[in-house]
Amino acid sequence: GLITSRLTDVPGSSRYVDQSVVVYSNEAKTQLLDVPAELVREHGAVSEPVGLAMAEGIKAKAHAGVGVGVTGIAGPTGGSPEKPVGTVVVAAVTDSERRVRTFRFFGERELVKFQASQAALDMVRRMLQV
């Protein structure tokens, strides 16, 4: 949501933004983006395989040139020793490239979300070299 909000703050963004999907629950990830439930069970919702599957899912559903998937723990609760609050996976895919990275952001929930959106936008910018 925040990524799309930031993209559509730019006049003329309808030329490059067609749609976005916010999938908060594991069920939404599987139902709307075709993320395999077994992938979520095996790796957890906040994992690089799930982030990539989300990016691939939205790209396929939207018939888009680029798909972006972000999954994470913004806090203040929900973290674990293995995946503390601030753990965010960002993935982006095109027809020719797949990128995924796990970040650890610090700060309040809103700051974690902003940093995640910044990381996603930067990843896409670097992929497209713009």
Where are these regions (language model features)?
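Short alpha-helical segments enriched in small residues
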Residues: 1-130
